[in-house]
Amino acid sequence: TLIAELGKFGPEDGIGIVSLMDHTPGQRQFRNLDQLRNYVRGKHGLSEEEFLHHVASQQALSDRLGAQHEAAAVAEARRFGAVLASHDDTTAGQVATSARHGATFAEFPTTVEAAQECRAWGIYVMMGAPNLIRGGSHSGNVAAKDLAQMDLLDILSSDYVPSALLSAALMLGDQWGDLPRGVATVTSAPAKATGLVDRGQLALGLRADVIRVARLAQAAAVRGVWVGGRRVG
């Protein structure tokens, strides 16, 4: 079980982040069962009967274990000394619960309502770089560019396309008319949200982690990499 798995780790393991994910059908990212049906049946080739069985079994597991697993994950994050993140919050109520748990940043809030509530609670909003580049969510949720337009986006995640991160930061710089602010979504903002106080900006006494980037049309090409002040690439 999740509780047993978490129990294998301790503060000495250096766990930095615990993310509270719940992919139960019918809520959060998968609140629209028709979209979930198309996704699951298309990816796994399930029949309608198999899909309905999948939904019912996942919902039954959530009913039986969801609350205790969530409580255990929050408690273990505190024991580890890890930063807590929420995941796919959809409603103001879910964000409020995340805030009470002590979440410092929200991974991929799925609605404007959730992002606005994050702002009210002082929770950093993180969205996926692929979402920004493609102009929308592959799951039909809120678009990163729309949250950026409403000043509700703080951090970019590479998500499932690591190479998208730099290009997306430059795109945000263009959208906001502020390149340093765009770059901050992949440097200082995530460093602050995750408690990495020794990095994220160029300042005396901090790590000298630097990349030199050339802009080619809408893409970013890395031309040099320094870690701790030493060139490694």
Question: Where would I find each of the regions flagged by the language model?
Answer:
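A general structural motif
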Residues: 64-66, 86-88, 104-115, 134-141
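His/Asp/Glu-enriched, well-ordered alpha-helical/loop segment
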Residues: 123-131, 135-215
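Generic structural signal for hydrophobic
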Residues: 9-10, 77, 98, 118, ...
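Oxyanion-binding "anion nests"
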Residues: 80, 93-99, 110-136
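Short, small/polar residue-rich loop motifs at catalytic or cofactor-binding pockets
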Residues: 218-220
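Metal-coordinating catalytic core of metallo-dependent amide/deamination hydrolases
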Residues: 1-91, 130, 159
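Glycine-enriched alpha-helix->loop->beta-strand junction motifs that scaffold or abut catalytic
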Residues: 12-15, 97-105, 120-126, 150-154
